[in-house]
Amino acid sequence: MPESETLVVFRILGVLAKARDLGHALPVAEIADAAHLGRPSAERYMNMLKHAGAVRAEATPTQLLEYSLTRYGLERLVGGCAR
């Protein structure tokens, strides 16, 4: 049975929350690997989350985009006010 998009989104937010705790952003390839997704699917979800304001894309010196969780995204994940 295919997973719901909601489950996938929360799995991605969880991956980004762990990276946030360590103080760094993740490239799409690492997000895809950690969330057990193919890279095209991960890119589609990251674009959707970026447009929703849940993640922030940052360019690196190697021109790869890395993503980090915004406060809004963290609040969606924990269901309240994140500090």
What residues fall within each predicted segment?
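Glycine-centered, phosphate/nucleic-acid-interacting loop/turn motifs that mediate DNA/RNA or nucleotide
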Residues: 53
